[in-house]
Amino acid sequence: RNFKVPFVKLGTFVLLLLILGILASWIFPDFNSLNSNALNTLKLGFSLILVGIPIYLLLEIYYNPDTIIKINDTLAYFTLLLERFILPKSVRKEVLALLGDVKGKKVLEFGCSVGTLTLNLAESVKPNGKVYATDLSEKELVITKKRITKRGHLHVVVIHDEHQVNRVHPSIPHVNAVVSIGMMGYMQDVKKILKEMRELLPYGGKIVFVDYADFFKMIPNVAWLSNDRVIEKIFREAGFSVFVQRKKGLFWNYVYVYGIKFHENIPYV
């Protein structure tokens, strides 16, 4: 229950003065002399804080849906500026190759970001195909819409879904293929999302997922993405036969998961 704490402002001020006083007496024990060891320890402490802040933010981005949306919105134009670095042309080519011929087909792009891959997909499905591009960041979708409108891609449907970490947007119709970049680590209910995707696909319909792993070689991966067999098992239980491959990058590695919707538990060849 709620309750009032007496002397909140005054108590905070007094406590702050007390802490500063202790620090001062530690660094300047005799007022005229400087304790170099204390100063070095203090510098080390501040350096650890400076290192810890970005690590904390990266962990928040990994695990907290609200933080994911806020960060993605804030960094939308920064993402656009660095899109060739974040999603290199070589990775895009591999994704399109794994997806195969989608000319005239319907493709769901689950997590389109600023439209980096969306533009390639829009060209690939021409002349009679359609791309459904969803994302949880409104600001990133504003950028995506501007880019596809500028190129006259009227066959691309852009959909904002703030609950994308837990579902496939209910307005998505049946599609021929699903592609997703950088979304597996954000999924809060992986099995539910995969089963919803399965319902939208025909038997033999392809899926291609790519995600980032070993961020800056120091950020821990989402647990289920750390083990290839676990990934295969989760996808198999959802009705997909998949391959899992890992490829090295400069600041992170890439996890490729690709395969098909199947009738029975048969290998994807």
Show which residues each predicted segment covers.
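C-terminal membrane-solvent junction of multi-pass transporters and transport-like membrane proteins
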Residues: 1-31
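Conserved alpha-helix/loop element of class I SAM-dependent methyltransferases that forms part
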Residues: 86-103
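Class I SAM-dependent methyltransferase SAM/SAH-binding core
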Residues: 108, 120-165
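A short acidic, Gly/Pro-enriched loop at the edge of an enzyme's catalytic core
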Residues: 168-178
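A short SAM/SAH-binding and catalytic strip from SAM-dependent methyltransferases
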Residues: 176-189
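A short glycine-rich, Lys/Arg-flanked "PGG" loop and its adjoining helix->strand segment in the class I
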Residues: 191-203
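Conserved beta-strand signature within the Rossmann-like core of class I S-adenosyl-L-methionine
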Residues: 204-212
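Core SAM-dependent methyltransferase catalytic element
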Residues: 247-269
